[in-house]
């Protein structure tokens, strides 16, 4: 077994999640790298549009079976899962959460529209909050309020992703913005698929932005003071995505271009360094969810 496969996957990625690992102790960093590699592989398996849907469904079923084996103490066959297995047992990561994550990415095989905000929220829970719920087990915590914190922050991050990626998703025929919102603001799906920005679209995006901000505020408010140190990596993620959401807002949500807006690496590093400094000074790392 090559113990570096998960690390290689993590290093290849430009993910904000991978950047947040820098604040973790070495043993937790290794565990998070393995968890991230699993999430990345499963997501990629669902997203490869050049592969027939039935084949992708079989691939995800194989991932589900293999991670179940790891959770049950049996030897998994996939290398990423073999690297993740010891951390599953060290941190008691439950199969139910891995299963929810796979359910979420399986949704992308068959569903390209979401009727209501509640329907979209369930999707966000499965593909993002669940990752947070697994991550906090690795971070370590004692106050169960951390689970509600991870749930809210995950939804905030995913809604930010959805707003950033509207244009890119439209190229694949996907519209994650709820159809009930489109109807309310008189935005036709065809306008999004043609990547036509309008003031009506701007108002629609502001509505979703408001929901995302609500989840950021909830995460900020619910995190116990006693758990701020343990959740510092999660808070760093929140800071990065909050800055991205603010950037999208300043652009009046001109997010229909093929290339999504992103924070520069220098900007991200600045956010990380600021978080490290505040953490070492005993100050609150959180900078998201404020007015």
Predicted regions located by residue number:
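Catalytic cores of Mg2+-dependent Asp-rich isoprenoid enzymes
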Residues: 1-158, 163, 167-291
């Amino acid at each position: 077994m090559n113990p570096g496969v998960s690390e290689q996957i993590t290093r290849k990625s430009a993910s904000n999640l991978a950047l947040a690992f820098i604040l973790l102790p070495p043993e937790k960093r290794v565990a998070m790298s393995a968890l991230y590699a699993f999430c990345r592989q499963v997501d990629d398996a669902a997203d490869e549009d050049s592969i027939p849907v039935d084949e992708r469904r079989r691939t995800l079923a194989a991932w589900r079976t293999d991670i179940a084996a790891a959770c049950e103490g049996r030897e998994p066959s996939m290398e990423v899962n073999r690297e993740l297995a010891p951390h599953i047992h060290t941190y008691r990561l439950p199969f139910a959460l891995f299963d929810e994550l796979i359910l979420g990415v399986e949704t992308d095989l068959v569903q390209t529209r979401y009727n209501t905000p509640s329907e979209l929220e369930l999707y966000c829970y499965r593909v993002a909050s669940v990752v947070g719920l697994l991550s906090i087990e690795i971070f370590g915590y004692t106050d169960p309020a951390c689970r509600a914190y991870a749930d809210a922050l995950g939804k905030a991050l995913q809604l930010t992703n959805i707003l950033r990626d509207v244009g890119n998703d439209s190229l694949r025929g996907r519209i994650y913005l709820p159809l009930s919102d489109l109807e309310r603001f008189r935005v036709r799906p065809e306008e999004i698929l043609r990547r036509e920005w309008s003031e009506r679209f701007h108002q629609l995006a502001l509505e979703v932005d408001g929901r995302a901000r609500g989840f950021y505020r909830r995460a900020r408010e619910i995190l116990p003071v006693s758990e701020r140190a343990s959740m510092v990596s999660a808070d760093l993620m929140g800071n990065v995505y909050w800055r991205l959401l603010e950037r999208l807002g300043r652009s009046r949500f001109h997010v229909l271009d093929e290339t999504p807006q992103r924070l520069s690496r220098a900007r991200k590093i600045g956010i990380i360094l600021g978080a490290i400094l505040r953490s070492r000074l005993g100050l609150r790392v959180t900078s998201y969810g404020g007015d």
